[in-house]
Amino acid sequence: MYISDRLKQKDNETFSFEIEKDRDFRILQLTDLHMGFGFLSRKKDRLAMTAIRTLIEETRPHMIVLTGDSTFPFLPKAGTLNNRRQAIKLMEFLDDFEIPYTLVFGNHDCEMGCVCSKRELAELYKKGKYCIFTEGREDLTGVGNFIIELTADSGEVLMPMVMLDSNMYGEGGWF
């Protein structure tokens, strides 16, 4: 979990992240990376990582937000079902930038037959050196439903960021 004087966890579903009120706060939002970290996805993973590195260098964000499908443990595409390894590799990659990041799960982060459940992945992501993540409330569908309040040093909430798990496939299968 990201540790900073600027970040406080208020409860199991709310963080407070202090930003400078009179300065633009840049968020780099990335979605559907589908990082496989398997033998079938090596080339695509390298291309994606190069693109992400370039985006970070050019935008110099204060926070990175991953909005689902960051990994893709699908055997025909990645060559692996090991989403635990994928999550660890993704965290290692992002932690190297030393920029706080947060994420939500999409429908591909835990494909059928994969190694870890969302709850198990949540425990992993909470260990990321720069990751801001919590499971959120138990009475809401999904894992990782939480709020990051971007606040001024006075405590005034300048902008709430609501992070929601988009969940998996509907009842009855994939479609």
Where are these regions (language model features)?
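N-terminal active-site segment of His-dependent metallophosphoesterases
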Residues: 1-84, 89
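Extended active-site neighborhood of metal-dependent phosphoesterases/phosphodiesterases
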Residues: 2-19, 85-175
